[in-house]
Curated annotation (Swiss-Prot):
GO terms for molecular function: ATP binding; ATP hydrolysis activity; metal ion binding. Belongs to the arsA ATPase family. InterPro entries: Anion-transp_ATPase-like_dom, ATPase_ArsA/GET3, ATPase_ArsA/GET3_euk, P-loop_NTPase. ATP binds at K35, G36, G37, V38, G39, K40, T41, T42, E245, N272. This is ATPase GET3. Gene3D superfamilies: P-loop containing nucleotide triphosphate hydrolases. GO terms for biological process: tail-anchored membrane protein insertion into ER membrane. ATPase required for the post-translational delivery of tail-anchored (TA) proteins to the endoplasmic reticulum. Recognizes and selectively binds the transmembrane domain of TA proteins in the cytosol. This complex then targets to the endoplasmic reticulum by membrane-bound receptors, where the tail-anchored protein is released for insertion. This process is regulated by ATP binding and hydrolysis. ATP binding drives the homodimer towards the closed dimer state, facilitating recognition of newly synthesized TA membrane proteins. ATP hydrolysis is required for insertion. GO terms for cellular component: GET complex. Keywords: ATP-binding, Cytoplasm, Endoplasmic reticulum, Hydrolase, Metal-binding, Nucleotide-binding, Transport, Zinc. It is found in: Cytoplasm; Endoplasmic reticulum. Pfam families: ArsA_ATPase (PF02374).
Length: 340
């Protein structure tokens, strides 16, 4: 996977690398997303490797049900953060964004607001199920549990295809509104419930109503804080990944518009799988495809002239394993130069 690399300085032009993300020390949340099959996981893994060089601790999280992180690093990951082999400050975990609310409401240990939601009374579970989007949104609490307890400096999300990603980014708002509603109902009907429960306020399953509401309020405050951080460009950014084809470009534009409506910063696009036929090549298919790619690449550059557009080559070998990912990651910060 050899590539010639050079430093480029185009004056006022946006730098065609992700170096600005590495340089922005304030960034805490980085999302990597795009249409399926465009190289999101390879890009997110490579970006995580580069960030690990300049950050104290980095956590890479997959929210894609396909869970390709394990394949990319040739190492099994689960819902608990685990150090990636060969790194001292880069960890990874895979969560299911469509996880069942029952799993998350089941007891998950002590010491954290999200985890302590376990043991909820049946009444509160019924209330939670009635809130639209809560089933997926509760999986976000699993992320908060890990992030809050382990204090990573930077968190990178390897997201699911576009539609799922946009829903996932709404989860903090969904949870915040849901928990606020639960709190409101508790305030309205709390005195009535306490009349039935008695002086100790104990639910039939042994859970204390007042303690449960305090835990919910703590979780709501945490989620509210994260929701605010997602909309702060100093703390959060989204890296769009695409290939130079019509559908991928269309999905990228839709995603950028949606992100803008959520107030989430995005100023970087990684264009993968670019063909660079060797001079004098008689491969007609390669030349024709390069011509098509060039057309869409020009559209990307015209539409997103204020973005960092990173151009990544189509490689002859699969990018799997630490060494190949490290080599690929270098092209995110130093532009690839096609053979002349």
């Amino acid at each position: 996977m050899s590539a010639t690399l050079i430093n480029v300085d185009d004056g006022d032009a946006m730098e065609p690398t992700l170096q600005s993300i590495l340089d922005q020390r304030s960034l805490r949340w980085i999302f990597v997303g795009g249409k399926g099959g465009v190289g999101k996981t390879t890009t997110s893994c490579s970006l995580a490797i580069q960030l690990a060089k300049v950050r104290r601790s980095v956590l890479l999280i997959s929210t894609d049900p396909a869970h390709n992180l394990s394949d990319a690093f040739s190492q099994k990951f689960g819902k608990e953060a685990r150090l990636i082999d060969g790194f001292e400050n880069l960890s990874a975990m895979e969560i299911d964004p469509n996880g069942s609310i029952q799993d998350l409401l089941a007891g998950q240990g002590e010491g954290d607001a999200g985890a302590d939601m376990g043991g909820m009374g049946g009444m509160m579970q019924d209330l939670a199920f009635a809130i639209p989007g809560i089933d997926e949104a509760m999986s976000f609490a699993e992320v908060l549990k890990q992030v809050k307890s382990l204090s990573y400096e930077t968190i990178i999300f390897d997201t699911a295809p576009t539609g799922h990603t946009l829903r996932f980014l709404q989860f903090p708002s969904v949870l915040e509104k849901a928990l606020a509603k639960v709190s409101q109902l508790s305030n309205q009907y709390g005195p009535l419930l306490n009349g039935f429960l008695g002086s100790n306020g104990t639910l039939p399953n042994g859970q204390n109503l007042n303690e449960m509401m305090e835990k919910l309020e703590t979780l709501r405050a945490t989620i509210s804080e994260v929701n605010t951080q997602f909309k702060d460009e100093r703390l959060t950014t989204f890296v769009c990944v695409c290939i130079p084809e019509f559908l991928s470009l269309y999905e990228t534009e839709r995603m950028i518009q949606e992100l803008a409506s959520y107030g989430i910063d995005t100023h970087s696009i990684v264009v993968n799988q670019l063909l660079f036929p060797k001079p004098g090549s008689d491969c007609e298919q390669c030349t024709a495809r390069r011509r098509m790619q060039k057309k869409y690449l020009e559209q990307i550059e015209e539409l997103y002239d204020e973005f960092n557009v990173v151009k990544m080559p189509l490689l002859v070998e699969e990018v799997r394993g630490k060494e190949r990912l490290e080599r690929f990651s270098e092209m995110l910060v130093t532009p690839f130069v096609p053979p002349s």
